[in-house]
Design a protein with these regions (language model features):
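N-terminal glycine-rich phosphate-binding loop and ensuing alpha1 helix
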Residues: 1-52
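Structural motif
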Residues: 7-11, 44-49, 87-91, 115, ...
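Conserved beta-loop-beta/alpha segment of the NTase-like Rossmann-fold superfamily
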Residues: 58-120
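Juxtamembrane helix-boundary/capping and inter-helix hinge elements in multi-pass membrane proteins
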Residues: 72-73, 266-272, 327-328
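A feature for the membrane-embedded catalytic helix bundles of lipid/isoprenoid biosynthetic enzymes
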Residues: 118-205, 278-390
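Conserved small-residue-rich
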Residues: 188-233, 237
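Short amphipathic alpha-helical coupling elements at transmembrane boundaries
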Residues: 203-211, 260, 264, 274, ...
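Membrane-embedded alpha-helical segments that form the functional core of polytopic membrane enzymes
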Residues: 216-272, 363-369
Length: 390
């Protein structure tokens, strides 16, 4: 168990702690990082209590329950022996940057290596050290230089980190902090097209919308509208509308990426949002696959499109709800893990548009390939489920 305490490193810290970075103030970001790092209690000088903090606490009950406001003269708790995680309120500290500090005990204290040489150390310290500085910590007076000196005297262990950390000392450092945050916006499931196309576009949208009251779910609904426009372009597609459909689908994907980025940047992640995002992605892909069959002409190809749409739906359901070890097991291999990603889907759409333009009579080939290929993922998962476990 660990306790966290936000402190002010110097006289310039209070306005910087209240400065917004990607839609949330630095002080709020530090509080959330402490909560997500596992802090059971987050002590915060009442000097940092402002309207933005209060709004965040209303939106995040778990954070509100963990935060304890410190006032001048409040006594330090002498009973608890849990170490303190000291966090400068005017720095950008991502939760992933705190992992090395909390990975192992530190009897003499530990300090985040990138912060060790500066006046705003991020440190895990034993209770006696906090007791020495408690009067100033509780009153919200600057303690950065004094803390840095005591850590050196105590022989605190410097621990490296790869997580984002930026010491914001002047207002011009806020831009660097925002850039560091953007590095964290990708997710493990991102494909090559996601990283090099969608994320590049979505970050422009996210930068704008995090400064507005727009919610991630509202952005998701916009991506649905754009996706429906892409489906319309592929339905009974012409050479022109097929290529237009590809471009509209690109825009839908960019907006779809922005909703998750906004949610992560503003701490609005939710189960509802995740389910809505998955549902919209599935609707768009299913609709486009069905459109490919309809555009190929004839009742038979319409049925082929319906078969492909069914396969996409089943694959999406299996990928969403199966345990990871079943969804992608060693016997299925990496191929099925990537069979439904957007890179492959783009290849399908571009192939369809090219054939509609250059060889219209051959577009049915794409619909047939999709109808057969879309079954591979869910059939592979089903085979793994039915296979006896060792």
């Amino acid at each position: 168990m660990v306790r966290a305490l936000l402190y002010l490193p110097d006289d310039a810290a209070p306005p910087l702690a209240a400065a917004p970075v990607a839609g949330r103030t630095l002080a709020v970001r530090v509080m959330v990082a402490a909560l997500r790092a596992g802090a059971s209690q987050i002590a915060v000088p009442s000097r940092l209590r402002d309207a933005e903090v209060e709004r965040t606490l209303l939106r995040m009950p778990a954070l509100a329950a963990a935060v304890h406001w410190l006032t001048p003269g409040v006594p330090v708790s002498a009973e608890e022996r849990a170490p303190w995680l000291l966090l400068p309120a005017s720095s950008l500290i991502h939760v992933s940057a705190l992992a090395p500090l909390l990975a192992a005990p530190a009897p003499r204290g530990a300090v985040l290596a990138p912060s060790a040489a500066g006046p705003a150390p991020v440190a895990l310290v034993p209770p006696p050290l906090v007791a020495e500085l408690w009067t100033d910590l509780a009153a919200g007076r600057p303690v950065g230089a004094q803390l840095a000196r005591r850590l050196v005297e105590a022989g605190a262990e410097a621990r490296e980190t790869t997580g984002p950390y930026v010491a914001v000392r002047v207002a011009s450092d806020l831009a660097q902090a925002e850039q560091a945050l953007e590095v964290t916006l990708g997710i493990a499931a991102d494909s090559g097209v996601d990283r090099y196309l969608h994320r590049r576009g979505s970050r422009w949208i996210s930068r704008l919308l995090v400064r507005t009251p727009v919610t991630p779910n509202q952005v998701s609904l916009v991506s649905l509208v754009i996706g429906l426009a892409a489906i319309w372009c592929f339905w009974h597609a012409t050479a022109v509308s097929a290529w237009l459909g590809v471009l509209v689908y690109v825009l839908a994907c960019i907006v779809d990426h922005a909703d998750g980025e906004i949610a992560r940047l503003t701490f609005q992640e939710s189960r509802l949002g995740a389910n809505l995002d998955w549902t919209i992605d599935t609707i768009i892909q299913v609709g486009i696959v069905l459109s490919l069959g309809v555009s190929s002409g004839g009742r038979l190809m319409g049925l082929v499109g319906l078969l492909g749409a069914t396969g996409v739906t089943l694959s999406a359901v299996f990928a969403r709800y199966l345990p990871r070890e079943i969804e992608v097991g060693p016997t299925i291999g990496g191929v099925l893990a990537h069979i439904a990603n957007r890179d492959l889907f783009y290849l399908v759409l571009v192939s369809f548009a090219a054939l509609r333009w250059l060889a219209p009579s051959c577009v049915f080939v794409v619909a047939v390939v999709v109808a057969v290929g879309s079954q591979a993922y869910w059939v592979g998962c089903l085979a793994r489920i039915r296979r006896p476990r060792p």
